[in-house]
Amino acid sequence: MRISFEEMAIKVADVVKDRSEDPYKKVGVCVLNKEGRILSVGYNGLLSKQQISNDFWEDRDERRKYIIHAETNALACITRYDEPYILASTLLPCANCAINICSHGIKHVYYTEEYHKDQLAYEIFDFYKVSLKKLNI
């Protein structure tokens, strides 16, 4: 049976998350246009070529200050002219990422896991009329 574009995007995001160096929480994102073509992928991590010591990852609160979210990394690679339509994430986006997602004109967000239920993220998606759906894949 042929899988849907949403399922494909989630599976791509699940593979992409393995690029993250974060040993505690790996997140992957895949952005599609209306035709189901992949526009961008992203994962949570530091800026490219950032040199860090191995003990950087041990202090959760310290590392969280510097990590760039997967959604931000994926959206940084596209423009509104690309007409992003669907964002699939392995984790429910936080409120800050929700605003960023909405500002890019994305209409549908799919995710597979809730790390922390972020009520504000739900409210933001609802306010901007972006559909949000948890997929069980």
Question: How would you name each of these model-derived features?
Answer:
Residues M1-I137:
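Zinc-dependent deaminase catalytic domain
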